[in-house]
């Protein structure tokens, strides 16, 4: 008796060819591997419909916890998280979690500026360039770190533990734009987010700069926040009447549009039942909102999905509040302040 005969005798369910494509959960019947092969021979293999890997959040955002593996400048550490940075582009944000009393800068490295260019949300320094031997290489399934640091940030030091947050470029999720300032008040900068941004994080990057980071949030269209080494509250206008699905507007301040200066903007979408993600193509995966706590300083926020990454800041105080960062890998007890080099606490 062959294995096929044996299993056919044990499992006697009737084989009914499904009446729809693979992703259609309403299709009746079950595909049998041998029937599938027979259909291939007969050129009758079913269509896979419109399943798109970019529709799933796991292909667009990943949290990865890893251990550093070197104190030198040539050893590598390959981080495989399934994100295609080499072909699609995106941002890698790394932070050291431990290491005794030694704090470490945040490190933001993106595919637009390249793997040797470092920015830190806890610093107003310009884009810093690491030694060519130490860098981040962007792969089609993650990234590879060479060496133990970039310029100021430890990202792979042996004996320390790190978290990385990877955002892949994708319409209605995340985009990166760079531009050179022209000194115009009301300068319009185009983007490829394909929707109106929910949040924009902007930084001047040229060497002569010591300008603070600037943040737009849809909660307060005509305000700006500074997320680097300060917990300041909302400041005066920067963003004009607010961004659209094709562009955003900046004034001519040194931190936003000084003539000849260079800038980078990280754009985050806000889905409002129009994300178009997931297998059904009708799911949201990112939101930028606001909430009010009750008398017990509690609040429940219904996003419509289970978040992996949460960043929040008090918005109704002139003295501001910390930028708090949490994620599902470290849990709600693992807090980072994006404006500080402090270790996880």
What are these regions (language model features)?
Residues 2-11, 15-345:
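Surface-exposed molecular-recognition determinants
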């Amino acid at each position: 008796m062959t294995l096929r005969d044996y299993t056919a005798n044990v499992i006697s369910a009737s084989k009914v060819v499904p009446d729809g494509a693979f992703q259609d959960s309403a299709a009746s019947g079950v595909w049998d591997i041998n029937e599938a092969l027979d259909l291939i021979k007969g050129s009758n293999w079913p269509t896979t419909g419109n399943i798109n890997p970019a529709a799933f959040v796991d292909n667009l955002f990943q949290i990865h916890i890893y251990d550093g593996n070197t104190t030198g400048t040539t050893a590598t550490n390959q981080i495989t998280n399934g994100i295609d940075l080499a072909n699609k582009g995106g941002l890698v944000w790394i932070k050291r979690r431990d290491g005794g009393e030694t704090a470490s800068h945040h490190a933001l490295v993106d595919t637009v500026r390249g793997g040797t260019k470092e920015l830190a949300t806890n610093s107003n320094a310009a884009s810093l360039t690491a030694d060519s031997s130490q860098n981040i290489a962007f792969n089609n399934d993650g990234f590879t770190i060479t060496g133990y640091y970039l310029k100021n940030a430890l990202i792979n030091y042996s004996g320390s533990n790190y978290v990385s947050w990877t955002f892949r470029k994708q319409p209605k999720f995340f985009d990166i734009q760079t531009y050179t300032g022209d000194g115009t008040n009301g300068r319009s900068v185009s983007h490829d987010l394909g929707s109106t941004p929910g949040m924009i994080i902007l930084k001047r990057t040229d060497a002569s700069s010591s300008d603070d980071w600037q943040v737009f949030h849809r909660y307060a269209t005509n305000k700006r926040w500074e997320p680097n080494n300060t917990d300041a509250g909302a400041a005066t206008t920067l963003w004009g009447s607010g961004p659209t699905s094709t562009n955003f507007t900046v004034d001519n301040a040194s931190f936003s549009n000084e003539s000849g200066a260079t800038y980078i903007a990280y754009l985050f979408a806000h889905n409002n039942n129009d994300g178009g993600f997931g297998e059904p193509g009708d799911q949201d995966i990112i939101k930028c909102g606001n909430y009010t706590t009750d008398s017990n300083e509690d609040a429940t926020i219904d996003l419509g999905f289970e978040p992996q990454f949460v960043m929040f800041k008090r918005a109704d105080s002139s003295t501001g509040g910390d930028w708090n960062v949490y994620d599902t890998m470290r849990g709600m007890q693992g807090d980072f302040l994006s404006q500080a080099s402090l270790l996880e606490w």
